Structure formats: C-alpha cells, structure tokens
C-alpha cells in the first residue's frame, strides 16, 4: 500500500461566526428575483418520544416473531387503519441498535409526497419511538387515473420554468416514460445539468386539502429543485424543495480551522477503517489523483456541471504535496494545494461520521458499499474554486444512490482573495447538509428539511459539527467561536452572534425564532443550543481532543464526541421536517437508546438554558419558551 502524503491537511477544528448584518446565500433563484421562502409549506410532523410510545404500545399486540419492518408496519396500520401506504426501501439498523423504517402515504396508488411515517424499533424488537405527517383529511373519492383529466407533464415543466424563472429551455421538451408510476423524463431541453424529470403525486396543502401535482425535478447547479406544479393548472406552484443547501464560511485542515491556526503538514495514510479501500481507490480501481470511494475532488473554474474530465493533481506515488502561501494570488496559482485540501477534509469527515454510524445502510456517500447495505455509486463530487459563485459554498443532496455535490467558492472579502477550501469549517458545514438530509426521513427522502424551522436546523447542525471538530485542548466552556471568520475576513464571522455559553455574548433563546425568517438565522439559534449541550456533556464526561472517539459498548467516552453521536442519532429518530421541540426529544431518545438515559438531566438542563426546557411548545408564530426541568431532574 502506498503512503498518501497530504500537504496542509492536518486535523483542523472548524467554526463559523457571524455578524449582525448576516450574509445570505446567493443562488440562481434569488438572482432571478424568486423568493423560495414564499413556497415553503408549514411543519406538519408529530413525534411521539420513547416515554409516550412506551405507554401507547402497551395496548397493542406485536408478535415476538416479527422482524423490525413487520413490527413497524403493524404500528402504522394500527395508527391509521383506513390509510394506504407503502414501505420505503431504505430501512436499516443503526449502530446504536435502533431499526429505522420509513413509510409513504398513498392515495389511489399515488404517493402523498409530504405524508411520511417513521418508526424506530428498539433492540428488544419493540417500538421505540415514531413520528408522522400523514394526511388525516378526506381523500378525493375520484381516482384521477380513470378519467386522466390532469395536465400533460410537459406543461408542468414549462409551468415550473416560468414560475421560478429557471434557466431551462423547454420549448422542444418531450416526455419519455421512466421507471415508476406516472413518471417521466424530459428530452429536448437545455440549461439543466441533467434531464428534468416529473412524476404525478399528491401534496398536502396548507389549508388541509390534497392537491394533485406534478413533482418536477430540475438541477440547475446552484439549485436542485423539486417543484410541485398543480396538475390541473400549470401556472400554480404549491411547494418548492431545494436539494442544495448554502452556507457562509471557509477553512484549512483537520484540527486547524484555517491558515491562522497553523501550517500545512504532511500526513501519511490518514484513513481509518471506515475507508477499507483507502482514499485513492474504490476497491476496483486505484487512482493516482484526488479520487476514490468517498469523494472526487477537482478544479472547476468555469462553474460548469461536468467534473470527470476536470483538472486534478496527479501523483503516481500518491504524494500530494504542493506549495501554498498566504500571499499567493490568484487562488488558481495554488489550485493543487486547494484540491488536495478539499479532498482531505471531505474524506476525513466521512471517516469520522462513519464511526458515529453514518455508514452504507444509513445512506452515506460512497461508490462501493461492499455489500453492506444502502445504494452505492454516490460519492461526493467536490469542486474546488468553483467559478459559479463567490463568498459562499453549497451542497446538493439527492436521495441515496445519487452523488452529492459540493461547490466551494473563492472569497473576495480580502486581498488577496481567499479560497473557501482552506477553511475546514465551511467544508464540514456543507458536508453536514448531506448527513442531515440523508438521515432525517431516511436515505431515500432528501426533502425532509425543507420547512423554515427544519431547514434552519439543517444550517445549525452544520455549524455545530464545524465548531465541535475545531475545539482545542486549551478551550473551556468560556471559549467563544465564530463561523466563517477567516474566509469572510471578519473576526466576528458570518453569524449574528458568536457561539458561546454566555447569554450576554449570545442571547439567543428558543423564542427568538418567533422573529426570525431566514434559515441561517434560525440555524444559529439551534447551533447555540447544541454548543451548550456539548459543553454540558464535556463537563459531565470530560473532553478529548483526539481526532477520533474512543468507544465503549458503542458509546463515545468523552463529552465532545458523545454530543456529536447523540445529535446524529437524533437526526435518524426524528420525523420528516421536525421542529425544535421534536428534535430535542429525538436527542433525548437517542440518549435513552445509547446510554439508557444516563445523560437525561444533563441534556434537559442544556436545552432549558435557552428556553427549550420542559413545557416549551411549538407554534409557528408564537413559540412558548420554558426554563423548567422535568420531574426527576
């Protein structure tokens, strides 16, 4: 095995800070005068945590001989005996022993696309917890497939293009039958990175009724959209989901957040057991470049959609060592270093998340899954110095089996300009969008963080992991961190407040969300709570600043890694499009599954500090805060 030498890729802590005048992601939609926020549907999900579930299922009869999918199916049938549904083909058992099964409600054989039911089965084979957003209103009596009075899918495509002002030419579009019921692929279009698609589905509307819609999928680079166009009126759009998540940060190498924290060093064979083929092979082919099973990294100065033939540094002896200087300009002069850095950070994070349970069955990003479950052929496509934008980054997360795509931009906020690939926190934040979108709602559903509050938590998880990874041995609970400070050339970073356990430094509370209308702002509130949680667990269990956790019976033995594990396990437990209260309950349930609730009161105290305590309630316009603890704490 050849040693892999990566210059400038030392373990780096990641963080992202913010200033009051927060920068917002720019993309195709916003540049074309379209506000995607106006198309978001409200949260519908309910979550029954493990305590409530234990009481409910006492009256239900389950056979000891049932497998976990059968047990989950029986629960759905007993909860909604008059509903029809299908099992989504993405169930798996997590590393914490919890089985995760997802269901999609149907009507007349068509999916109700935002009607989901997730069931979590414990090690004992019993229902552990569950959540759902099933439609409870009246199903249309008439089967639309009989009279077929709905519009042609081509009209729906044209309606989506017009409503969202998309850069897609559809005048000559023709619909070709694809796999699935009433599913089509469009030929004869230009402007999209891949052929647009459409399939006929129902959608729950805000008024509580069902709409028959064409779900039109268009990948236009900065936005990878699912547009729900009314099947009877192609000028009406009911909802838009964007697989692309944007952020505002930048970084350098593992343990080092950016070039201000250290110098490039050479690291030999940095992969862990999570990458059995190493980082430069997919088990079938060995690559003398920045390509392997988990990721493929390349230069993309034009911002184009192709990547296979793009430039990558070549090294037959697998020594990727290239010069870099903080005064070097333009960034393209050190593109070899940049691509290598991005490749290292992406792979290193893949391996860490794998140890926490984001593996093949859970929907991670790999070409070759080695018969370990999940769908392969979906490494992360990571573009360095992408020319399609500046001062930002994004990550597109399609369902398991399709590659994720990260675009890292240059930042014009300093002279010389700075390269986002060198701020690890930005890379980690972006990749975390892939993690949360694959886990929440199951690997086959990447549309479970598209409401305002759940989308905000998606941003918050990215900031949390970026910050947790950058912690230093000298840090204490009084240490504050920013997000994206180096890339933005602003010590305050790109968030409204620093991440701090001090309520004077960061005054965000649960009820602060009542006045926030943007996902990065809401995400800062959520990440602030998780930052408090991390320090509470560090105080309870001690902190280790090694790159990888030490496990005992599947439990990380230090508070920092334990917080990362519990937060990740909570993503898989919570319902599709959760709110803060449900995500908190899912973290508590994750602790019950992993440690038998050994950290219950510690977790409650951390959330109660910022008003998400016992008795806190969700209401889209008037959230109720609480600093109380439950009985027994």
Swiss-Prot record:
Entry annotation: catalytic residues: 430
Subcellular locations according to the entry: Secreted
The enzyme's E.C. designation: 3.4.24.-
Gene3D superfamilies membership: 3.10.170.10, Neutral Protease Domain 2
UniProt KW keywords: Glycoprotein, Hydrolase, Metal-binding, Metalloprotease, Protease, Secreted, Signal, Virulence, Zinc, Zymogen
A Pfam family: FTP
Molecular function GO labels: metalloendopeptidase activity; zinc ion binding
Chain positions recorded as Zn(2+) binding sites: 429, 433
Propeptide: 19-246
Keyword Protease recorded: yes
Cofactor note: Binds 1 zinc ion per subunit.
Cofactor: Zn(2+)
Gene Ontology biological-process annotations: proteolysis
S-S bonds: none
GO cellular component term, pick one: extracellular region
UniProt-listed SUPFAM superfamilies: Metalloproteases ('zincins'), catalytic domain
Predominant localisation class: secreted
Role summary: Secreted metalloproteinase probably acting as a virulence factor.
Family: Belongs to the peptidase M36 family.
Name of the molecule in the record: Probable extracellular metalloproteinase 3
Classification of source organism: Eukaryota, Fungi, Dikarya, Ascomycota, Pezizomycotina
Gene: MEP3
